[in-house]
């Protein structure tokens, strides 16, 4: 197999598998193609021309029915057989009896069916009888033996497709394990048949790989959009669930198409929303009330009424264009056309122009805060929507955020035509005729999910004309909790409520310049909230315009109507753009990506996920290091890795896979080092065993990591049963490890390499460079975000859970729950007191005992007013003379259906995950390429140390993070000498070149001098644990300037930490002192769905998180001395690894 240049996506392609790799045949055979040619050539050259015959009523060849037919199948015991049977049951039975000198028994002369066959066999009383039940390639055998035989010969019947046949003969067969064909002596299977059998027929592998669906990134040109941009302010309310944040203020602004904005403004005015700005064009609407949940109820009413208005508007539009619906409704016995159900409407052929209406509820960080606070009020879908609409909902809480909360009201699209020509899809276009429905979509979108930065930083990054203000949150909180707050001499909120002195003075000066009299904290908070909404509204417009320009110019899709808010996150947008570029390059002409890239599913999904190994992050030195340290960082590590070749195509069947594995084994036996771009090696995912070289040939940057001990460890121990990519196999082999490929049915080999994402990364790099030249900060931010987000979309982890409201459980889901396919994992209820309409107070009822004489116990007034009809009626047999009283607690009548506020978390009963969205193997290979980068990096530092024991080596690196390495002065010298071609300052490529295949990556020194820009170092540093370290300063060896250092403390409040604090913490622990170092920070606990009694669903509670600061205790490395750490190895094994590995020793067999 050889590597050739692609004419589509730039990359490396392999030639089709060579025809010589075919299964060996036991005898001569004639290929079907040759047989056809031979048959065609055998026709008589001088054949007489056909004579025109008279026209016949029936055409076609008359073929006599074959007397004997045959099938091949597998018996219960696994044996393959061929069953020959007679096509005519009656005549075959008669001939069989006559041959054995018997007359046909009367019982067998009756019509024989599948149901009466066992009874008739017992009546015939043959010495031995069999029934073979055939179903989908397998046969189930049932035996009968007569105690007093009437027939001396056996009867054998075949039941196939509901019919009964008499078996003539049963003979053994063989079956090809690669293509599933049955044969007796010889067999030759084709590559196409082997592939089809493996991917579509074989029960164990037929559902391992799924095609990835595709839809263009654009939207119909006539889509109507409305944006409701809002923000809320909260105060702390102390309740039974802790300090709960309660909104008391909500401000929103309306953007979008003019007619939709006007409709929403009219509705806001009707519902008495206050106006913050008198200008109608930029008016903001707000509501202020400290009443708990009142804000949510009012906002819910606005959103529900808006849904009803647009739904009625769309239905009126359809009704005007289809007046015949009035007649259809009358024919169905309905008074109003809107009473037609969604299923009934699908049967009618609608006319007219479709409408596509999208309403976005937008805010900054609302999916992690605001929407959770309001969710108990706004999540309901039960609005007054005509039943003619088909309603669907996508509600997905994940990791403390509302990832999706979308509702769609849809009607059939009269313009819909199934696509046959997909050329416009290659340009990212979506026509009205491509969509099956016309719709109204209500979607929640978060600008934080599209920018990954605070609103203050987003205003700078996207060059907005307004900027975020400041608010004394704690003062507002105390005002609502206590009725007052601390003020300075001028009546301004005290300094303690502000971030620092600078923020306090700046805001106080602004207040004084406004000259509005006494400080009104509520008005100031309203102005602050309104300013946030204005900033967010500008950001929304900026994102829409800038992404449209980016798609048009940088991606070169000028005809695409792209809306970045159509997808909720930057990751989902980057993945959609990547698939669009790939679709344009490969032109599959289908509604999916064909076999260009496929998604692992079911058993294969878990297998591929096992090959995804995380980043490297650990110190090899604990304590204070009093020597220079340089910090190197890989430039755009994931982006560079994405430009390299990746596996493409439909995975090979077991036969071709075995041939490809043999090529790897041969290369590892014959060559000490193997090229990553060897033409004979195909990409794959393998199960391996690997043994490291001798102890003195190891280093502190192992080529691979393992989870066998329960935690991810970068280890030099022997590897057993690890799932790796073919790149890791080469990396381990080149580092001196002995790698053995273990037979595994899940082992996957792909037919070719392709640079699938190279074009995507290249255009983002070009856009970023162009933005730098033109100083376009917005385009630079977009290009950088999209470039970094793609890898994460491939690594998305799926699960079998989904959260639904009770009213979303349709008949198909209910059936799956009843059958056990789904299990209700938990049920949660949103806060119900906000839905309360009426409360009946507590009351007591006393019930008198049952007695045969009611008049004797009843008061006189009762007897006179309600005389009994039969005063002599008998009472019950057993009398009860004790009074019984019942105390009824207050009854709450809810203004909602129970289905509206009951959430169910459903989980599939099977652990297997169906995946048709993400090519997870791409994420695995991205990380494998990064490990190859670091492996090459380690050779620059440690190649000369081979043969020297680890404890005698010079310290060259002290800390390694995912894409960075902290080196000593000796490590810096080696990088300047041996690794100079990988230094960005010396020039080099960040994008892989298919014409000159080699590892492509660059690093740069992150510790730079602030004055002259030269490489600088930290004169002293301290390392306590992974992601917990500090650099004292940055000292420039050129100009001697000493700049500020760097501190990293994940999970801690870094505002209270410094280099001296971390240093003191280390020495206190070393000397076993009594000092305790800890940090505290305010944390927000977001709860969406929960089964815990002390946690209320859809709430945000405020808690103080305190963490102890201390050196690394539960290390995942071996301590060589008081400071130095080395990875586990044979000499120093991982104490956590208790897993038993069974091995077969050759000398004992």
From Swiss-Prot:
<keyword id="KW-1194">Viral DNA replication</keyword>
<keyword id="KW-0239">DNA-directed DNA polymerase</keyword>
<keyword id="KW-0548">Nucleotidyltransferase</keyword>
<dbReference type="InterPro" id="IPR004868">
    <property type="entry name" value="DNA-dir_DNA_pol_B_mt/vir"/>
</dbReference>
<dbReference type="GO" id="GO:0008408">
    <property type="term" value="F:3'-5' exonuclease activity"/>
</dbReference>
<dbReference type="InterPro" id="IPR023211">
    <property type="entry name" value="DNA_pol_palm_dom_sf"/>
</dbReference>
<feature type="compositionally biased region" description="Polar residues">
    <location>
        <begin position="1"/>
        <end position="28"/>
    </location>
</feature>
<dbReference type="InterPro" id="IPR006172">
    <property type="entry name" value="DNA-dir_DNA_pol_B"/>
</dbReference>
<dbReference type="Pfam" id="PF03175">
    <property type="entry name" value="DNA_pol_B_2"/>
</dbReference>
<dbReference type="GO" id="GO:0003677">
    <property type="term" value="F:DNA binding"/>
</dbReference>
<comment type="similarity">
    <text>Belongs to the DNA polymerase type-B family.</text>
</comment>
<dbReference type="InterPro" id="IPR017964">
    <property type="entry name" value="DNA-dir_DNA_pol_B_CS"/>
</dbReference>
<keyword id="KW-0235">DNA replication</keyword>
<dbReference type="GO" id="GO:0039693">
    <property type="term" value="P:viral DNA genome replication"/>
</dbReference>
<comment type="subunit">
    <text>Heterodimer with the terminal protein; this heterodimer binds to bp 9 to 18 of the genome. Forms a complex with viral pTP, DBP and hosts NFIA and POU2F1/OCT1 for initiation of replication.</text>
</comment>
<dbReference type="InterPro" id="IPR012337">
    <property type="entry name" value="RNaseH-like_sf"/>
</dbReference>
<protein>
    <recommendedName>
        <fullName>DNA polymerase</fullName>
        <ecNumber>2.7.7.7</ecNumber>
    </recommendedName>
</protein>
<feature type="compositionally biased region" description="Low complexity">
    <location>
        <begin position="31"/>
        <end position="49"/>
    </location>
</feature>
<dbReference type="GO" id="GO:0000166">
    <property type="term" value="F:nucleotide binding"/>
</dbReference>
<keyword id="KW-1048">Host nucleus</keyword>
<keyword id="KW-0808">Transferase</keyword>
<feature type="region of interest" description="Disordered">
    <location>
        <begin position="1"/>
        <end position="49"/>
    </location>
</feature>
<dbReference type="GO" id="GO:0042025">
    <property type="term" value="C:host cell nucleus"/>
</dbReference>
<comment type="function">
    <text>Eukaryotic-type DNA polymerase involved in viral genomic replication. DNA synthesis is protein primed, and acts in a strand displacement replication. Assembles in complex with viral pTP, DBP, host NFIA and host POU2F1/OCT1 on viral origin of replication. The polymerase covalently transfers dCMP onto pTP, thereby initiating complementary strand synthesis.</text>
</comment>
<dbReference type="GO" id="GO:0003887">
    <property type="term" value="F:DNA-directed DNA polymerase activity"/>
</dbReference>
<dbReference type="GO" id="GO:0006261">
    <property type="term" value="P:DNA-templated DNA replication"/>
</dbReference>
<keyword id="KW-0238">DNA-binding</keyword>
<dbReference type="InterPro" id="IPR014382">
    <property type="entry name" value="DNA-dir_DNA_pol_B_adenovir"/>
</dbReference>
<dbReference type="InterPro" id="IPR043502">
    <property type="entry name" value="DNA/RNA_pol_sf"/>
</dbReference>
